[in-house]
Amino acid sequence: MTHQLHQYHLVDPSPWPLTGAMGSLLLASGLAVWFHTNNTMLLKFGLLTLLLTMFQWWRDIIRESTYQGHHTSGVQKNMRYGMILFITSEVFFFLGFFWALYHVSLVPTPELGAEWPPIGITPLNPMEVPLLNTAVLLSSGATITWSHHTMMKGNKKEATHALMLTIILGAYFTALQLSEYMETPFTIADSVYGSLFFVATGFHGLHVMIGTSFLMVCALRLAKHHFTITHHFGYEAAIWYWHFVDIVWLFLYISVYWWGS
């Protein structure tokens, strides 16, 4: 911050946006190749490139904020605006799935048998695994709030324990969702019901895995005393993201599982 007369962080040139874009392209191309040829080599290479980019990029951001002091109050304020806009974009992303779901379910076409769920589809019981998943995810929302409150009081040990419990619940949710996918009596190719079910819940599951990774990084940083009562935006952003995932699941449970049954 020497000789800097403003509060903004002027970042140094970085290769990570380029490698991240390349990794995303390889990942998307690898998915297409996997679907058509059952070859996962390009998919694995793209995923590895993306993971390495994420690790290096996050490392640089942590160094700039924690050790170099570049994240001033003004920078943190702009980061909050950025996170709010990002979550807003995610809201509209999922809104498209809900729009499609209600578009086809409120007025089913003759091709679907003029009923919802379509003829031949046996929906999952919303009172079984989906209800357990709801309880698990809502519990994780409570534990992450507990972690945040105790951290704000300076009790980092209890905050770490609550955060680890949240991570365990997130991993448990993912495992339950995977077991549910393996037992569903329909596939993604079974009419618009199957495609909407797997795409909507699948993207939500992907967000849960991303959020769990986000929280794992925060747990590591919390253990290394990177966060203080006044300087912990990375942790706060992870909490916002996790609560967003909770809320989306509630709408999915009501719309896909309960309404869809």
UniProtKB/Swiss-Prot annotation:
Residue ranges annotated as transmembrane are 16-34, 41-66, 73-105, 129-152, 156-183, 191-223, 233-256
GO biological process per UniProt: mitochondrial electron transport, cytochrome c to oxygen
Give residue ranges on the Mitochondrial intermembrane side. 35-40, 106-128, 184-190, 257-261
What InterPro entries does the entry give?
Answer: Cyt_c/ubiquinol_Oxase_su3 (IPR024791), Cyt_c_oxase_su3_dom (IPR033945), Cyt_c_oxidase-like_su3 (IPR000298), Cyt_c_oxidase_su3-like_sf (IPR035973), Cyt_c_oxidase_su3_a-hlx (IPR013833)
Provide the top EC class: translocase
GO MF annotation terms? cytochrome-c oxidase activity
> What would be one Gene Ontology cellular-component term for the protein?
respiratory chain complex IV
Provide the catalytic activity annotation.
4 Fe(II)-[cytochrome c] + O2 + 8 H(+)(in) = 4 Fe(III)-[cytochrome c] + 2 H2O + 4 H(+)(out)
Q: Where does it live in the cell?
A: Mitochondrion inner membrane
Q: Which CDD domains match?
A: Cyt_c_Oxidase_III
A Pfam family in this protein? Answer: COX3
Which Enzyme Commission numbers does its entry carry? 7.1.1.9
User: What keywords is this UniProt entry annotated with?
Assistant: Membrane, Mitochondrion, Mitochondrion inner membrane, Translocase, Transmembrane, Transmembrane helix
What family does this chain come from, according to its entry? Belongs to the cytochrome c oxidase subunit 3 family.
What is the role of the protein in this entry?
Component of the cytochrome c oxidase, the last enzyme in the mitochondrial electron transport chain which drives oxidative phosphorylation. The respiratory chain contains 3 multisubunit complexes succinate dehydrogenase (complex II, CII), ubiquinol-cytochrome c oxidoreductase (cytochrome b-c1 complex, complex III, CIII) and cytochrome c oxidase (complex IV, CIV), that cooperate to transfer electrons derived from NADH and succinate to molecular oxygen, creating an electrochemical gradient over the inner membrane that drives transmembrane transport and the ATP synthase.
Name under which the protein is recorded: Cytochrome c oxidase subunit 3
